Amino acid sequence: MLLSARGVARRFGSRVALEPTDVSLAGGEVVALVGPNGAGKSTLLAILAGSLEPSEGIVERPARVGWVPQRAAHYGRLTALENLRLFAALERVPPTRADELAADFELPADTRASSLSVGNRQRLDVALALLAAPQVLLLDEPTSSLDPAQRERVWHIARAVAESGGAVLVATHHWEELEGLADRTLELVDGRLT
């Protein structure tokens, strides 16, 4: 397993956002995580990514995890290219990788991220998640603001990560988008995997 979570749960005060949950991701697979708004999908992904501590349970993850949260993962006052170069430096990735991703995603080089369209900001966040060649890619509603061509591109990237031996977990409301892509589906309802 590339990623394993055992008994992870999360409470915010007295509110239970995520019941004790077990999740594992194997290399070579794309897994869809579906459920309604407020089901706990974003909470689970944040725990798996390591940006939110579980109230209980344990997560074993590889060193390189790429994560696209629902909320922006970039700095609005920097340009797309500056964001990519900053995160490349933090991840000890050659700056040429940042330049390649900016070109691959057709991101405007001189426009502040805060001035980009919602779709371009989403593409920037996907590019940031790919900087360090992640072994696990966690995507939280990554295509909600993308046009069909860009949406298809993100799904192609997800499949490429899996085909190279990585694992991908995609949270979405629209499981039909992932029918041809996902190897299996997990459903989360009221903080419980069903």
Model-derived features: where do they sit?
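The feature captures the beta-strand-to-loop junction immediately N-terminal to the Walker
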Residues: V34-P36
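Helix N-cap at the start of a conserved alpha-helix in ABC-type nucleotide-binding domains
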Residues: P148-Q150
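Helix-to-loop junction immediately C-terminal to a conserved catalytic motif
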Residues: A49
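Catalytic Walker B motif of ABC-type/P-loop ATPase nucleotide-binding domains
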Residues: L137-E141
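Conserved H-loop
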Residues: G166-A171
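Conserved structural motif at the start of ABC-family nucleotide-binding domains
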Residues: L3, L18-P20
